[in-house]
């Protein structure tokens, strides 16, 4: 790719130069180009309009007859499988902490294995990111659940990121919503989520605060926009 060509040219022109500096210069230039194209020309890395969403598709069930419910959701190259398990009220999670005690009848677990980004890393313990993403999707889904009087079962989800190119947490909301419909959970309405991004252009003032500057908001950000963008925020609803 371009980075390999740049590193080769850099090594030829400056054989005693720092490799880390070359990588930093390349990253800075790409960052400037991504910002300039978005802010001045409304152009994104994959050619989409600023408010254009990638191709969507979803499948309810079809994974295994043994599962209580499942949903697969695709948004571009982001693919998430969500598996639903229903249990009796006694299967709830018992909360016994310093500040919180009670029972939890709805749980959502999120996994982000290395293969979802084409890596062969070790499958370790759940990290802080996975816990946070799982909690984020859980909060988004909690509002569409039926009341316990009409549906007293314990509801448990595991959302597995199969491929990642932006916002697997919000794709988990979509896949879990599909899984609940597949499993016969009488949800109030289907829920969906998406990631928004911000591209900001502006020099720093002497006070250290950013002066008013042009900005653009992107809908459905993917990997490069998430990496080079200045801010991202997740939105979920019905």
Question: Model-found features: residue ranges?
Answer:
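Mobile "lid/hinge" segments at catalytic clefts and subdomain interfaces of large enzymes
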Residues: 180-202, 208-238
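A short glycine/serine-rich beta->alpha loop
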Residues: 121-127, 159-167
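A generic local secondary-structure boundary/capping motif
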Residues: 60-63, 70-72, 94-98, 143-147, ...
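Glycine/serine-rich anion-binding loops at beta->alpha junctions
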Residues: 65-75, 161-175
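Stable alpha-helical structural segments in soluble proteins, enriched in small hydrophobic residues
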Residues: 29, 136, 140, 144, ...
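Extended amphipathic alpha-helical scaffolds
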Residues: 1-101
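A glycine-rich phosphate-binding loop feature that marks nucleotide/adenosyl-phosphate handling sites
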Residues: 2-5, 23-28, 49-55, 154-162, ...
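Glycine-rich, flexible beta-strand/loop modules in the N-terminal catalytic cores of phosphate-handling
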Residues: 68-153
């Amino acid at each position: 790719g371009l980075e390999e060509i740049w590193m080769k040219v850099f090594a030829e022109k400056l054989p005693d130069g720092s490799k880390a500096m070359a990588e930093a210069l390349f990253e800075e230039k790409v960052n400037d180009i991504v910002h300039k194209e978005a802010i001045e020309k409304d152009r994104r890395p994959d050619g989409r309009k600023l408010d254009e969403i990638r191709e969507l598709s979803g499948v309810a069930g079809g994974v295994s007859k043994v599962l209580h419910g499942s949903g697969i959701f695709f948004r571009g190259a982001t693919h998430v499988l969500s598996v639903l398990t229903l249990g009796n009220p006694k299967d709830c999670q018992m909360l016994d902490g310093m500040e919180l005690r009670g029972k939890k009848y709805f749980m959502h677990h999120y996994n982000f294995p290395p293969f979802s980004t084409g890596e062969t890393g070790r499958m370790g313990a759940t990290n802080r990111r996975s816990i946070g993403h799982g909690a984020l999707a859980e909060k988004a889904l909690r509002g569409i659940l039926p009341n316990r009087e009409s549906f007293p079962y314990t509801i448990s989800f595991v959302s597995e990121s199969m491929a990642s190119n932006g916002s697997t947490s919000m794709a988990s909301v979509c896949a879990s919503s599909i899984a609940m419909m597949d499993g016969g959970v009488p949800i109030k309405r289907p829920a969906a989520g998406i990631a928004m991004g911000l591209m900001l252009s502006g020099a720093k003032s002497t006070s250290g605060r950013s002066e008013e500057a042009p900005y653009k908001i992107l809908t459905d950000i993917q990997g490069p926009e998430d990496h080079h963008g200045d801010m991202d925020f997740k939105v979920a609803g019905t």
